[in-house]
Structures are given as C-alpha cells and as structure tokens.
Curated annotation (Swiss-Prot):
This protein's name: Photosystem II CP43 reaction center protein
SUPFAM superfamilies: Photosystem II antenna protein-like (SSF161077)
Residues engaged in binding [CaMn4O5] cluster: 352
Compartments in which it is found: Cellular thylakoid membrane
Gene source species: Prochlorothrix hollandica
Membrane topology of the entry: Multi-pass membrane protein
Gene that this sequence comes from: psbC
Cofactor remark from the record: Binds multiple chlorophylls and provides some of the ligands for the Ca-4Mn-5O cluster of the oxygen-evolving complex. It may also provide a ligand for a Cl- that is required for oxygen evolution. PSII binds additional chlorophylls, carotenoids and specific lipids.
GO MF, one example: metal ion binding
C-alpha cells in the first residue's frame, strides 16, 4: 500500500477532513499551499492564453476575416488596435505572436511559483510574516486583502486607458470609411453621462450598459472604474469593517468563495449581453455581425440589388402590404421594410452614414451608398449568428462559409452558461457558509460517499 509522507499532511481525508478530489477545500487552513494552488492555477490560465494565441497565429489566413477562422483571442487583441489597418484589416500578426510568447513565459514563472509554494514554501504564510496572514475569521485582514485586490483591478483598468490614450489607441469601428485605429484624446468624464447608463432601460434602443456606442464613453468609463477601484482599495486598507458589516456578513473561507462566484456570475451575464448585442466594444469586423445587424444587412443588400435593377425602393410593397424595402417605424422613422422591421432599432457604423434626421434618407440611399458599405452588408448577411453553440454546419444561407459558427455565439453562449453555473455555485456555497455560521449541519454526510467503501488502488 502506498503511504504519504508528512509533506502531504493536511492534504488527504485523514488529516484534513476532505478527500483528495475535493480540491482546494483540503487547503483551507494551509494558506501557503493554498497560495501555491492559486498561483499554479493562474499559470494554467496564462498558459492556455499564450498557447491558444500562438495556435491562432499559426492558423491565421490573411484572406479571411477573423470571425470566419474560429479565432476567439485574436479578435480581442485586434480590438486593442494591434496589427490592424483601415477597415479592420489585419496587417501585421507580429504583435499577436509577441503577446502569445510573453504569456507562455509568464505561465512558466507562475508555474514555478505554484510548485514552490506547494512543495517548498511554508505551509502557512503566517510562518513567514503576519502581513500575509489568511486567517478567514480575521475581519481586518480580510478587508486588507480586498483592498489589495481592488487596487490591482484599478491598475488593470488604468492600463486599458493608457493604451487608448497614449500607446497607439484602440480600434474604433465608427471611424468614417469603415473603421480604423485611433487615439482617444477626449474621453468622456461626465458622471451624468457615464452613470446614466446604469439608469437606462435594458430594452429597445436604450440597452442599459450594453447600449454604449462610442469609444469616448468606453474609455471614460474605465477611468471612473479605475478611480473607484483605487479609492475603494485605499479605503479598505485604511479602515476596519463597521460593526454592521461584522454582524451581518459571514466571515469564512466558503463565504468569500460564494461572494467571488456571485461577482463572476454577474460579470459573465453582462459580458454575454455585451458580446451578443454590442458592435462597438466587440466590433463586427472581428467578431462577426450581431443578429439584428445581419438582418438589416440582408435588407440593405437586396435593396441595393433591386434598386440597380430599376425598382422604386420608396413605394414598392411586399406581399403583406408593408413596404418591401422601406417603411415607417412606430415612431415615424424611416426604416427597412419587411421582416427586418423588428430590428429597426439597430445602429451600425456601416449604416449610420445613410440616415438623416427622420431615419434612413432616401436621397442618400439613391446617391451616396459607398462600395465598402455594400461589401460589408453582403458579408454580414451571410454570417448571421443563427447556428447553435455546438453546430458544425451553420445555416443554409451561408454558401461561402463551410462549418461556420458566428464568434458571438461561442463567446456569448459560453459566458452565459458559465455565468449560470457560477450563480449556482454562489447559491450553493452561500447556503453552506450561512449554515455553518448558524451552527447546524451542512452538506452530505461523508460516511455515505461511495468512494470511502472502495478498495485501495493497489
């Protein structure tokens, strides 16, 4: 029978109360080893990011848009303005290669740190310094840790702002002529504008946070986020929890886990909606069109085609009596006709130049349509996010896109699914933490676990 050395005391069922497959629960009271597990986990995440970036670089095809190549990381890098030319064309993949290599190097450092803290470092950080204490019931120390985390998040938001304002700028799909990289020189700082997004309706053209449609507001929002993170971090480092917080909150490792999972769930749901609906932060040049965008692109493409064949786009009627090409919205705005009228609230960089004060401008549609707008609409029309997340065939209207699944489906679907499971995890661990704090039984009796009645492997 294989025996474990003292090195693994606290890591098995007999010495920790948790079986080996219970993960980090075995390390609740071993802060040093718990740090090692977290650092190693970070190394795995960074390794995936680097390896996947290099994989996408190795398979990159210049003739195809990113959303046709199944890439999920290069679009993020392109949105930051690296290697992108006018119209969202990828002109240089060297920055992507460098980013991938830097992530691989970073993952090696993190991996070594994880191994060190798991095998060689002190089992509890308190042995090294009280500054790194992780006593879950030490309320003052827990708020210190929260403060440091907020400051790190503030640094991350600040780096985004610096990139936008001082280090090359960001890709802006609203640059005239089809999009381009530009430096954001005048970010929005007005609190009434930025915090006004929080009070918008989530429906129709309002779109709550997801309705942001200019890079000035995006960068300005990150400035405010960074400022709040820095102020909040300093506050939690300087102050001690108020009495109401000491009494009302549960102070335990599992409670902190539940709080974190709840926050991740919220961010997952918001990210899902951003990916699915927003074409400013997630440019369609890299991620493919949104559902409403593909629908409007189809109407626009057929309008241009039939107009060139002699159709009167202003008066033609469809089989239902509605305008075949153009009609009026419930508010009187001129919109595309037919089935796509349900998406009349859509706003896109390729379509907005054709609007006037009362909606789509007939004179502009007759005389001012540019070739790049026609090409983009035709491309978006055939790349609608209509397949399922596990589809391999897409939809039948995609003659030039074999096995195509719109990137927005992958990213929005995965973030929504992960957000849902994080929410379940939040509720599960919150219930366990509250039960433990109340002093009654939680979870399942370990005596009933089948694995405990099984024979040894050897």
């Amino acid at each position: 029978m294989v025996t474990l050395s003292d090195r693994f005391v606290g890591s098995d069922l007999k010495t920790s109360g948790y079986p080996w497959w219970a993960g980090n629960a075995r390390l609740i009271n071993l802060s040093g080893k718990l740090l090692g597990a977290h650092v190693a986990h970070a190394g795995l995440i960074v390794f995936w990011a680097g390896a996947m970036t290099l994989f996408e670089v190795a398979h990159f095809t210049p003739e195809k848009p990113l959303y046709e190549q199944g890439d999920i990381l290069l679009p993020h890098l392109a949105s930051l303005g690296w290697g992108v030319g006018p119209g969202g064309e990828i002109t240089d993949i060297t920055p992507y290669f460098i980013v991938g290599v830097l992530h691989l190097i970073s993952s090696a450092v993190l991996g070594l740190g994880g191994v060190y803290h798991t095998l060689r470092g002190p089992e509890t950080l308190e042995q090294y310094s009280d500054f790194f204490s992780q006593d879950w019931k030490d309320k003052n120390q827990m708020t210190n840790i929260l403060g440091f985390h907020l400051i790190v998040l503030g640094i991350g938001a600040s780096l985004f702002v610096f990139k936008a304002m001082f280090f090359g700028g960001l890709y802006d799909p609203w640059v005239p002529g089809g999009g381009g990289v530009r430096v954001i020189t005048n970010p929005t700082l007005s609190p009434s504008v930025l915090f006004g997004y929080l009070f918008r309706s989530p429906f129709g053209g309002e779109g709550w946070l997801i309705g942001v449609n200019n890079m000035e507001d995006v960068v300005g929002g990150h400035i405010w986020v960074a400022l709040h993170c820095f102020i909040g971090g300093a506050w939690h480092l300087i102050t001690r929890p108020f009495n109401w917080a000491r009494r009302s909150l549960v102070w335990s490792g599992e409670a902190y886990l539940s709080y974190s999972l709840g926050a991740l769930s919220l961010m997952g749901f918001i990210a899902s909606m951003f990916v699915w609906f927003n074409n400013t932060v997630y440019p369609s040049e890299f991620y493919g069109p949104t559902g409403s965008e593909a629908s409007q692109a189809q109407s626009f493409t057929f309008l241009i085609r039939d107009q060139r064949l002699g159709a009167n786009i202003a008066s033609a009627q469809g089989p239902t009596g509605l305008g075949k090409y153009l009609m009026r919205s419930p508010t009187g705005e001129v919109i595309f006709g037919g089935e796509t009228m349900r998406f009349w609230d859509f706003r896109g960089p390729w379509l907005e130049p054709l609007r006037g004060p009362n909606g789509l401008d007939l004179d502009k549609l007759n005389n001012d349509v540019q070739p790049w707008q026609i090409r983009r609409a035709a491309e978006y029309m055939t790349h609608a996010p209509l397949a399922s997340i596990n589809s391999v065939g897409g939809v039948i209207t995609e003659p030039n896109s074999v096995n195509y699944v719109n990137l927005r489906q992958w990213l929005a679907g995965s973030h929504f699914i992960l957000g849902f499971f994080f929410l379940i995890g939040h509720l599960w661990h919150a219930g366990r933490a509250r039960a433990a704090a109340a002093g009654f039984e939680k979870g399942i009796d370990r005596k009933t676990e089948p694995v405990l009645s099984m024979s040894d492997l050897d």
